[in-house]
Amino acid sequence: MSGSMCAETVRIDGHDGDEVEAYLARPAGDDSRGGVVVIHHMPGYDRATKEITRRFAELGYDAICPNLYWRDAPGAAPDDAAATARANGGVPDERLIGDVAGAAAHLRGLAGSNGKVGVIGYCSGGRQSVLAACNIDLDAAVDCYGAFVVGTPPDGFPLQVKNLVDQLPRLGAPLLGLFGNEDSYPSPEQVTELDEILAAHDKPHEFHRYDDAGHAFFAVDRPSYRVAAANDGWERITAFYATELGG
């Protein structure tokens, strides 16, 4: 495809019918296509996340990123909104599920939608991607180094989160997981634990682990960026969504 696309800020119906700001990117043309909900990382609804959203449009998908911190600090700069959300303990799981469900419904209501929607999240969004796929009708999920899908947050961790072990039997979509072997949250041992739990419940999943990569290896604007891991990860994501979403 040509890669031509358009992007805009929209409003969607989120949890409990709340109006939520979101960033929508769409490829040009009327071809039938799947959709991708992008869950932003802990630093928030920032330029890097919007670039990722546009990248999915360039790949041929309708893509949307809801601003999960919209209620905490409407109109605030990403860093300020993220700080406010952290001070509030992070995004409650129930609210996250409702906002992602609203984003998925928005994508399915667009002209040209083939009805298939995937979700992807980075950092805290990786855990939230798995959470969403355990509670919402989705067709594919990608977890990029999401912490505390298994395991327990350390003392002093700013977000009020618990692991998803009790929810994993409800995982309703194939899962692609991308992890760095130098990460601590999730650690390689935690990735292995997650792999074993999913296998025990016969959940379709595909994990890839990268040496010389830790947390946030996709983040091009951070010292944690690792070119080889990120490039391979994007190839895995592209192939996975092509299979599961019909792209």
Locate predicted features.
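N-terminal cap/leader regions of alpha/beta-hydrolase-fold enzymes
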Residues: M1-G247
